[in-house]
């Protein structure tokens, strides 16, 4: 059975996974994800038509962003769960089709089939359905941007925040991707519009998070352990960890964060829980080793899951929820009737487990989102004016397995002492435990939070632009050296481009889905570049 996927940075040979995913997904899972996306595009066409006369389906809105999230790298490896979503999507599409007529409807709208036909159909609707290399490249760039946007939309939705304009754009974009006559120029316009709406989606999530949990504040986070049973929470969904904290309060069970959930410790309304005791481990890709010693159950609220080895001792301790899935793991169902998710099964499991084994000790500092940094604006501005801070380096983004990512550790270590790193996302784990010191009390690594908190870094940049009276954001002493891995990094990139940021450097490699011509458009119009060596790049950036 064949597959084709090149949506992540680690795609095989830098061109595409064709036998199995480097991420661990099988061809069956990859193909069912392709078919799910195909069904989603059809639903989007119908719902977009219904929206024009005020009859759009809220059920379709939710299905679309949840299904898109399901197909993000490392989110869902459960073929049966994905097939179930496809069947649900076909039923939803049929219901919508009975409410509106689409002239010259694309195959995405007209195809229906049962499970026996899914695999055969999936072979015809994936990335390679588009023969023109540049059209394919731009279509997938938009696709991946929309996937990343869907993740941020879902997190905001879980906190009660919806923006019909974002729903409408996502579905408009998906409908446009069904067109066989779409041009390169139209797709470039659509790509830029995706970036603009990515800014809106990140702003909405920032509002949702801060209105519920307060503005992130400077916080010390323990990276050791206590002598109580624990639950390890991975992923990004703050609503999930909040409800788990509430349901475990007073039980004697400690809650630890993992990877991208680290910033939960920065929010006042989450850090108030005394049994939110620390962060365990490092970036997502080290979980095969680190989960062995945690001893307690692990909850994946979103990506990033790495399928465990067959002999892993923690296999029966994995729980998934939301858009995530892993065959053999226990799934925590969605909320119903306005009630919380029921985490009792994972809580009872934790009671039977030994406490985690320490793999490191000490503390790390974070919480430098836009409100906190702007509160320190006078201090920061003075440091820049006095020359104490020569340059800021935005090193936000994702971490990953490739050995070449040691570049980011070396880069951080070799930066001069008069520079400051602004970070968000799990890329931080390459350098957030290094003894890099501070500048006049300002830590040299300022962690804003999760990957979506790259929005905070953009807000900080715009505030500095205002303070220094600069017409162009690119005149600031800021260098963008971003590590990417999956589709949320794609929407962050497109959002930064929409905000006018240029000369962004992406690594450790440029995306495989960018054709040579599309890559050249990004270079010519936005100054997008790659990386070389830490020494060469530092010399170039400081010249």
From Swiss-Prot:
Q: From which domain of life does this come?
A: Bacteria
**Which cofactors go with this protein?**
[4Fe-4S] cluster; hybrid [4Fe-2O-2S] cluster
Would I find Oxidoreductase among this entry's keywords? yes
Recorded hits in Pfam families, A to Z, give:
Prismane
Q: Which GO annotations describe the biological process of this protein?
A: response to hydrogen peroxide
Q: Where does [4Fe-4S] cluster bind?
A: 5, 8, 17, 23
Cysteine persulfide: which positions carry it? 398
**Where, in this chain's numbering, is hybrid [4Fe-2O-2S] cluster bound?**
236, 260, 304, 398, 426, 451, 486, 488
Q: How is the cofactor bound?
A: Binds 1 [4Fe-4S] cluster. Binds 1 hybrid [4Fe-2O-2S] cluster.
Per its record, the protein catalyses: A + NH4(+) + H2O = hydroxylamine + AH2 + H(+)
Write out the annotated subcellular location: Cytoplasm
MF terms from GO for this chain are: 4 iron, 4 sulfur cluster binding; hydroxylamine reductase activity; metal ion binding; peroxidase activity
What Enzyme Commission number(s) appear in the record?
A: 1.7.99.1
Q: What is its main location?
A: cytoplasm
Keyword Cell membrane set for record = no
At the top of the EC hierarchy, this enzyme's class is oxidoreductase
Q: Which UniProt keywords apply?
A: 4Fe-4S, Cytoplasm, Iron, Iron-sulfur, Metal-binding, Oxidoreductase
Q: Name one GO cellular component term.
A: cytoplasm
Extract the HAMAP family matched here. Hydroxylam_reduct (MF_00069)
In the record, the note on similarity to other proteins reads:
Belongs to the HCP family.
Q: What does this protein do?
A: Catalyzes the reduction of hydroxylamine to form NH(3) and H(2)O.
Q: State what protein this is by name.
A: Hydroxylamine reductase
Tell me the organism: Bacteroides fragilis (strain ATCC 25285 / DSM 2151 / CCUG 4856 / JCM 11019 / LMG 10263 / NCTC 9343 / Onslow / VPI 2553 / EN-2)
Q: What gene is this protein a product of?
A: hcp
